[in-house]
From Swiss-Prot:
EC number: 1.1.3.8
Compartment(s) where it occurs, according to its Swiss-Prot or TrEMBL record: Microsome membrane; Endoplasmic reticulum membrane
Pfam families documented for this protein: ALO, FAD_binding_4
Keywords: Ascorbate biosynthesis, Endoplasmic reticulum, FAD, Flavoprotein, Membrane, Microsome, Oxidoreductase, Transmembrane, Transmembrane helix
Described function: Oxidizes L-gulono-1,4-lactone to hydrogen peroxide and L-xylo-hexulonolactone which spontaneously isomerizes to L-ascorbate.
Name of the protein: L-gulonolactone oxidase
Domain (FAD-binding PCMH-type) ranges: 17-187
Name of the encoding gene: GULO
Enzymatic reactions: L-gulono-1,4-lactone + O2 = L-ascorbate + H2O2 + H(+)
Source organism superkingdom: Eukaryota
Co-factor(s): FAD
Class of the enzyme per the UniProt entry, highest EC level: oxidoreductase
């Protein structure tokens, strides 16, 4: 058995959270995972499984045992007739996408980042956009996990169904996910279209946009009424990409980071920067054709703070208008672009932000140019207040201020999930500070 490594330091991608676990493990077999859990039981230690550290919160942090499943990354089974793929939980989506493409398959929807582990990305409710599509976990048809007692447990819509409703968004609190079976679709290409609008126009015609494009989303540029609309739809057209190092990186990365760094010292520049980059990169019509996963992924640029809440889709207009009005009436508060707005179908996953409601996700961002912190407290607090006012639920992977008493009010199935968690992990082996605030 891997005896674990001492002195390992974990830091998330955004470098906003870190920890130094007592022992760090990279098991290579299911039996080694069982031995790690046995050791933790013997020594009364807690265990956290971490993926690639993309979550902008402390959800993966622990000072006990940290386990990474990156060496458990195989495809175990391919059911060509049903288009089901069973893969180990440590496989990266980027690797899975390539293997699926070689099989003539694809996932029907994925998030913005593919350098993430399969078992982790479903555990926090990762989503993309498309009102016909649920969060990523809705594509899961079966899972196998190991409980704190070292038992393996299979679940699906027909086997241990209630546990399946919980494990598809598990928060790392139910056990160690061993493998996942995913419903795939035939490989497809995406026609991407980008065009300018105003926020007033988009909100006034929201239903039309939702019907017009399968994967519709938009960027709003705070301190302006400017919006860039993105349509993404399946196509048989040949691949056609337009990539420019100058515009994408010299301007869209390096110049932007430099100007945002200057704005730390001259905050009044932020509205000007938002307008400038809208004009430089987002004000013109553009179109491309890409392989589906390449179309869904995009560059998250440099280090950042983000917050992302889902609210009932009928509250989209009210929430964005309230946020815009507040920023307009508080000129000393600065907000970076973009505010990204996406749409997701309802589901029956117990802790899904989309539980039993079609949802709009509103994601705000404040960059940390060259690692420099930017004032954001007032913006963050008012954003959360507006989201709460409009029936919002926070993205589990992203930092928020809610506690158990809040979740009890906004999640009808919260107590049901808690009962399942207590049944599978009665001693709290898989808890950490993040989860204690959630469940206690």
């Amino acid at each position: 058995m891997d005896q674990g490594t001492m002195g390992y330091q974990f830091e998330n991608w955004a470098t906003t959270y870190s920890c130094e676990p007592e022992l760090y493990f990279e098991p290579t077999t299911v039996e080694e995972i069982r031995q790690i859990l046995e050791l933790a039981n013997q020594r009364n230690k807690r265990v956290k499984v971490v993926g690639c550290g993309h979550s902008p919160s402390d959800i993966a942090c622990t000072d006990n045992y940290l386990v990474r499943l990156n060496k458990l990354n195989r495809i175990l089974q391919v059911d060509k007739e049903r288009k089901w793929i069973t893969a180990e939980a440590g496989i990266l989506l980027s690797d899975l996408n390539e293997k699926l493409d070689a099989l003539g398959l694809a996932l029907s929807n994925i998030g913005a980042v593919s350098d993430v582990a399969l078992g982790g990305v479903i555990g926090t409710g990762t989503h993309n956009t498309g009102i016909q599509h649920g969060i990523l976990a809705t594509q899961i048809v079966a899972m196998t996990l190991m409980t704190a007692a070292g038992d393996t447990l299979e679940c699906s819509n027909t086997v241990n169904r209630e546990i399946f409703q919980a494990t598809r968004l598990h928060l790392g609190s139910l056990g160690v996910v061993l493998n996942v079976t995913i419903q795939c679709v035939p490989a497809f290409r995406i026609h991407l279209q980008q065009f300018p609008k105003t926020l007033t126009e988009v909100l006034g015609d929201l239903d039309t946009h939702l019907k017009q494009s399968e994967y519709f989303r938009f960027f709003w540029f705070p301190h302006t009424d400017k919006v860039t609309v993105f349509y993404a739809d399946r196509t048989n057209k040949p691949i056609k990409t337009t990539s420019s190092w100058f515009w994408n990186y010299a301007i869209g990365y390096y110049l932007l980071e430099f100007l945002l760094w200057i704005s730390v010292f001259v905050p009044r520049l932020v509205p000007w920067i938002n307008r400038l980059f809208y004009w430089l990169l987002y004000s013109a019509k553009a179109e491309q054709v890409k392989r589906s996963d390449k179309a869904f992924n995009f560059d998250c640029l440099f280090k950042q703070h983000v917050s992302d809440w889902a609210l009932p889709i009928k509250q989209t207009r009210a929430a964005l208008e309230q946020l815009k009005d507040w920023l307009d009436n508080n000129p000393n508060v600065r907000a970076h672009f973009p505010v990204e707005v996406r749409f997701v179908r309802a589901d029956d996953i117990l802790l899904s932000p989309c539980y039993r409601q079609d949802s709009c996700y509103i994601n705000i961002i404040m960059y940390r140019p060259y690692g420099k912190e930017v004032p954001r407290e007032g913006y963050w607090a008012m954003y959360e207040e507006i989201m709460k006012r409009n029936g919002g639920r926070p993205h589990w992977a992203k930092a928020h201020s809610l506690l158990r008493q809040d979740f009890e009010k906004i999640y009808p199935a919260f107590h049901k999930f808690c009962s399942i968690r207590e049944e599978l992990d009665p001693s709290g082996m898989f808890l950490n500070n993040y989860l204690e605030k959630t469940f206690f």
